[in-house]
Design a protein with these regions (language model features):
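Membrane-lumen/periplasm interface segments of specific transmembrane helices
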Residues: 194-237
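Extracytoplasmic catalytic/substrate-binding loops of multi-pass membrane glycan-assembly enzymes
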Residues: 21-36, 46-61, 71-74, 215, ...
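Perimembrane helix-loop-helix junctions
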Residues: 145, 172-205, 317
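Membrane-interface transmembrane helices that cradle and orient dolichyl/undecaprenyl
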Residues: 97-99, 136-154, 162, 255, ...
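Transmembrane-helix signature of polytopic, membrane-embedded enzymes
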Residues: 91-114
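Specific aromatic-rich, kink-prone transmembrane helix
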Residues: 90-93, 129-146, 151-160, 178-184, ...
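Short acidic/glycine- and proline-prone juxtamembrane loop motifs at membrane-interface regions
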Residues: 119-129
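Membrane-interface alpha helices of multi-pass inner-membrane proteins
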Residues: 151-169, 173-178, 206, 290-300
């Protein structure tokens, strides 16, 4: 039964994104990685042959798909469809892991797949960064739950991929996770995970540096284009931010509504259960709520197309 649901979910997630990817386009954003993915096939590389401020991971993955299936619109959309299928199946599996009824898990995952990548249809940096961050969140939750080395190794890799998709919202998620892990370590007196996560992150950095060196990409070019220049954009957006009830609260009201059961359930436990802050459920709650607010903050600051309504079925499922 589980395998049948997974197969159905994969097919549905792929097909629904292929459908909406062919329904329409955004004049600039929809083509953002078509040209750059094709340029990699021609032997050019980001940071070296063309200026780029986000999305190198997306460009290389798109180049692979173009190589396998040809440089056409359907293989371009397939990129987003694959990510949609991966995060939808991952959502289904983690809900089952937390003993949610398999039918409810399937239902929430189907709704998730409709609200995830189909909002764009085509590969987009914000989506990739958010979804790889979500996969990292899943891995972290499982690391806390099962205490397996694999998950402690995996989540830094996923966060690194998220960051190389786009600096934000991944940076906000990274900061949130660091704060949670500091709290987790001090309260639970567990520090062993540090060596596994650090070695994982260090290995990823070394591989990226070796790859960049082979391709002739200068570290200075990467730092200038991907780290320093985008900070000027972010600083300007933050300085231009103006609080409005509609933009900050009203626009995300359905996400806040989905948060209410999870928030009050855990608030009740914090108040009435002695030592709840030592319980694993408390850290699941922290991870989910800080991930949610990281994405909301990102949407408020960037004021791009709203794409985070996939949080609604996810939050209800964990409530």
């Amino acid at each position: 039964k589980k395998n049948i649901f997974i197969i159905i979910l994969i097919l549905f997630s792929l097909l629904i994104n292929q459908y909406y990817g062919n329904k329409g386009i955004f004049p600039v954003d929809s083509f953002a990685h078509f040209d750059t993915g094709f340029r990699i096939l021609l032997g050019e590389h980001p940071f070296k042959n063309y200026w780029i401020v986000s999305g190198p991971i997306i460009d290389y993955f798109q180049a692979i798909l173009f190589y396998l299936f040809g440089a056409n619109w359907q293989s371009y959309i397939l990129h987003a469809s694959i990510i949609n299928a991966v995060v939808s199946v991952a959502t289904f599996l983690i809900l089952i892991k937390f003993n949610l009824n398999i039918y409810y898990s399937f239902f929430y995952s189907i709704i998730f797949s409709v609200l995830a990548y189909p909002t764009s249809g085509t590969p987009f940096v914000d989506h990739h960064s958010a979804f790889f961050s979500l996969l990292a969140v899943y891995s972290l939750i499982l690391a806390i739950k099962d205490d397996k080395k694999f998950h402690w190794v995996l989540f830094p890799l996923l966060l690194s991929i998220a960051f190389l998709s786009k600096q934000v919202p991944s940076s906000y998620v990274i900061i949130s996770i660091i704060l949670i892990l500091i709290t987790f370590s001090l309260i639970k007196k567990k520090y062993y995970w540090i060596k596994y996560s650090f070695l994982s992150f260090a290995s990823f950095i070394i591989i990226v540096l070796i790859f960049g060196n082979i391709q002739g990409i200068k570290l200075s070019s990467f730092l200038q284009q991907y780290i320093f220049y985008p900070q000027t954009i972010g600083t300007q957006r933050i300085s231009d931010f103006e609080f409005t009830f509609r933009g900050t609260i009203g626009h995300f009201k359905f996400i806040y509504i989905a948060l209410i059961p999870l928030f009050f359930l855990n608030l009740q436990k914090i108040i009435f259960e002695k030592g709840y802050y030592k319980h694993k459920d408390f850290y699941y709650f922290l991870v989910l709520i800080l991930f949610t607010f990281s994405l909301i903050f990102h949407q408020i600051i960037t004021r791009n197309q709203t794409f985070i309504f996939f949080l609604i079925p996810l939050l209800f499922a964990f409530s």
